[in-house]
Amino acid sequence: MKSIGICTRLFSALVLACSFAAEPVAAQGFPEQDGAAPTSVQAEQKQPEYSTSVESPLVVVDALVTDEDGNVLMGLKKGNFRVLDDGKPQIITDFATTDAPITIVILMEYSGIAYDYFAYKAASWGTEFLDHLEQQDWVALVTYDMKPTVRVDFTRSKPAVEQAMRSLSYPGFHEANMFDAIADTLDRLEQVKGKKSILLITTGVDTFSRTRLDEVFDKLKRSNVTIFCIGIAESEYLMADLRAGTSSIGYLQMKNQLQSFADLTGGFAWFPRFEGELPDMFRSVAGTLSNQYALSFSPTQESRDGKYHKLKVEVSGPDGLPLKVTDKKGKARKVVLYARQGYTAPMASATAND
């Protein structure tokens, strides 16, 4: 019972961390990079049965550079970076800090499994995440149990998220089909331009998804979406570690899955034990999205094979050696770089299907 109490307070804070002063706002549509309202998340997107050839496709890799303490390293230049495509160095054609509008989906588990983690108290932690986003950024809220439900379509008005949070009542289903929810969200984001991210707030439990785990990974490899995961059942993981049997293995597997989603896409995964850890986590998500470097390169003709390619981003100092940084006391600190681990290459040519 002690474990459940910890999780209850923790998930309560997570819910309210996305909430602040209520103001009814109608929110429709997914944003295009130019600021216009894009295709709605609520509409089914039918994919065309053909593809078009692209003369000079660009692969954009967002990279975050920090020290081992999580301090962001800014002021780096194009010459500090090297991008490897399947081990082969690429010419970085475009380089910039990422100041384009952010598009982020808050994808939150809302099932009978997680209901005990909710509470209805006023709190101000929403500012820890939403207030760090810029006015031009877009946020959507999607919850899931047996299936995903769009609570707030993409909006620039952050209070719409809080309004939707307050409307949540007792979940209608006990199931939590996480894989289906991730796959559905990725499908909806496919037609959205610009910088796209998912903030996944979940126990990590998947009950009866039709989508398999390997299919989720395949979709992630084909997308350019960064996933940030907050595993809300860490106290349960800790309790499982104290017990013998399959439960400990199951919890470890769920944690590893969330960590893998983040690692593959260049994001982070957190597993907070206490409520007090949450504000820093939400600030980290917002800070990451606003402090990345955008590195672009054009794949060679031979590389345009429609296959998955492994990416590696390296950062070096002016002398070409690994970048070295020190803290205020002059102590050497390790440099940590976050970037997606690969991309699916375009085809060199394409024709319409019959």
Regions found by a protein language model. Give the residues of each.
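Charged interaction patches that mediate protein-protein contacts
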Residues: 1, 13-17, 236, 350
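N-terminal secretory signal peptides that target proteins for export/translocation
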Residues: 1-7
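Scaffold/interface architecture of coatomer-like assemblies
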Residues: 26-354
